[in-house]
Regions:
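Residue-level "edge-of-site" marker
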Residues: 85
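Conserved beta-strand-loop surface patch within small alpha/beta domains used
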Residues: 1-79, 88-145
Length: 145
């Protein structure tokens, strides 16, 4: 299970709003609990460095990955995953998302339409490099932003 504290959750939602209709992205930081769940306490927004159609794809630069690792070390916090938006599409990873995914990370996807976050879901790669959904708290938002 992945649990996102209210502050980081609001930051992610605001990031989606300000970049809509393009995809946005960022890093998820926090702690792993003894029961295996992940508590997200901090996010780090990054620019979508994708050239071309940012409405359907996102890309995080190598430099941003290095800065993300540095941020984790400097703040004594774990880098646990990545979030990104799916404007006008479901919160289900695409094949492009799967190919670009790294093991261990949680991938939180925010499905958005104009002025609304429809769903937030989280995914992790299994041993066969396929996405499996992980429980997310909360799972349905259906609230205006």
């Amino acid at each position: 299970m992945i649990i996102v504290e209210s502050g980081p959750l609001e930051e992610m939602k605001a990031h989606v709003v300000t970049t809509f209709p393009d995809e946005c992205c960022g890093f998820l930081y926090g702690a792993e609990q003894t029961n295996g769940s992940r508590m997200i306490s901090t996010i780090l927004k990054v620019n979508n460095s994708k050239t071309g159609d940012k409405k359907r794809r996102f890309e995080i630069s190598g430099k941003d990955y290095m800065l993300a690792e540095k941020f984790a070390l400097e703040n004594n916090i774990l880098l646990l995953g990545i979030y990104h938006s799916h404007p006008n599409h479901p919160a289900i990873p695409s094949e492009h998302d799967r190919v670009a995914a790294l093991p261990y990370f949680s991938y939180v996807i925010l499905s958005a339409t104009p002025g609304m976050i429809d769903h937030i879901r989280s995914w992790k790669l299994n041993d066969e490099t396929q996405f499996e959904e992980e429980a997310f708290s909360p799972t349905h938002l259906n609230q205006s932003i």
